[in-house]
């Protein structure tokens, strides 16, 4: 098995990192998936990555049909439309990985195309998006982690390794991918959400016992849910229990979204934990408050509270 026809769905911070790395290979057919006005914009303006303009091949889902390997790197609220694109692209041999945040995107995708097409994965890249520009440090980026649910190395995980070889991408295969995914989810919930509510840099976690307490409350609820689902987060590699190195002023993706007046992925973070908590009978008061607080900040950004 060799992956030669590669399709990337999503050209934001994560998609740009993947495109940057794979564009260094000259023996693959690499494309970004887009349609309509967005397709025209990318073809005209390109992708501005670390102050360099890349002009990707842009294909519609129909044009990319039969791809060997599909990499999903969209925001959570774009997943439903991305799934429709995936359904158009996938055929019998196609392998799909999702590099989205959260713990349920693989399930959503597999429900539409079948679990046999999906290799669970995650990514850790400390990136910043400003307008149409994406910045990241390739050297400090932890990168892509992938593996089969049963922990066995397979023909398709070895094909992923061969694809990533010779690029600037950082990657590794793991035999405990579900623990790794939940470990990253734990980091995202603990690091993204308290600072997003406050609008401050990550240094606040070490400088304020009160912010640290909020983070602890959010994470304890997540830990209880993971335990109830049989996920042992402690099995994750040490690199999955920490984020990429950042400065105290750093603002993670949820706060970056609010700063730019974009809607966030709070449905995927606290929203998912609230849903799972209800299913399992586990209270989630910290996540419920955080969910409503960030939703209210989105409404504020939308201009809903501009009273005269």
Model regions and ranges:
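NAD(P)-dependent Rossmann-like dehydrogenase/reductase catalytic/cofactor-binding core
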Residues: 2, 216-308
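NAD(P)+-binding Rossmann beta1-loop-alpha1 motif at the extreme N-terminus of oxidoreductases
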Residues: 1-55
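Internal alpha-helical scaffold of NAD(P)-dependent oxidoreductase catalytic cores
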Residues: 4, 41, 88-89, 112-117, ...
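Residues at the C-termini of beta-strands that transition into short coil/loop
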Residues: 34-36, 61-62, 100, 122, ...
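A structural signal for isolated positions on well-ordered beta-strands in alpha/beta enzyme cores
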Residues: 7, 29-31, 97, 145, ...
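Rossmann-like NAD(P)(H) cofactor-binding subdomain of soluble oxidoreductases
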Residues: 50-134
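Short, well-ordered alpha-helices that flank and scaffold nucleotide-derived cofactor binding pockets
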Residues: 20-24, 84-88, 111, 271, ...
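Short, charged/polar "capping" segments at the starts of alpha-helices
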Residues: 38-43, 106-107, 154
